[in-house]
Structures are given as structure tokens and as C-alpha cells.
Amino acid sequence: MIASAALTTLLGLGVWFDLRCRRIPNVLTVAGLGAALVLRGVLGVGALVDGVEGAGLALLLSLPPFTLGMLGGGDVKLLVAVGGFMGPVRLIGAFLMIALVGGALALLEALRRRALGEVVSRSFAMVKYLACFGRFGYRPTLEAQGAMTVPYGLAIGVGSVVWWFAAGGRL
């Protein structure tokens, strides 16, 4: 119960900051990871190791999208804190749920901007270029005119909470 309260508080604040400021503060993510590891440490060395492995796996899984500019640094650090709570086994399901929520948010944003056709066309072109040449072609930055961004902290928050409680809501 304490872990559920700590995780939902962390994620609620992360979502709030991401929606309001488009950034997730380091103090929040570090405190979240610290809380996860302390709570796991109380349960024993095995639980603590599980939390460290979950945090490490979250870092490994989120680095590729970060290097491609698909995630911000705050998103990565929030995912690492989530990994500390989830552990490596539940983290895989959480990442899939987060990706589904993030995809739905991106689709809604494209529809809101009336840019769904353009987004689909660019996505196919990017995949085609990657398949033909083994690397990504032109990728507009977030500062490019008309760049579409989604506050991924919202996807992380919703996806993580749904998966946490679906998996039992305990460390």
C-alpha cells in the first residue's frame, strides 16, 4: 500500500510537471528511485536487487528512444524510477502499456492537428529509408516548424499505474 501511494504520487507529480512545464524535475525522479529502493530494501536484499535490476533495465530500454529524440531526459529518469518500483519482470509489461498509451496520445494529437495523413506518410518514409539504407534519414528536431510533440510523462504515468495495479499493486 505504501509502495502504491509512493508510485502514484511520483507519477502524478511527473504528469503534472510534464503537462505544465514540459519537463520532469531531477529532484522528483531521484526521490522516486530512492523511495523505490528504500521500500524494496525493507523487504530484503532480493527485493532490493530486483529494484536495481528494474531500474537498470528501464535505462537500457529507454536509451534508444532517447538517442533518437523520441524521449526527453526527464522521461528516461522517470522510467528508471518506475523500473525501481516494478522490477525487471513487471517492467516489460509496463513498457508495452506505456507504448500503447503513448501511441494513442500521438494519434489523438495528430487528429487534433488534422495532420494524420502527414504523420503516417512520414512514418512510412522513415521505415522505408531505414529498411533500404540501415539508418534513419532526415529527422526533424523538436524545434522544427510544425514538430508534433506529446508530453510522454502522461503516457508513462497512465501506462505505469494501469500496469502496476493490473499486476497486483505490490513490490
Q: What are the language-model segments listed below?
A:
Residues 1-171:
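A membrane-topology feature that recognizes alpha-helical transmembrane segments
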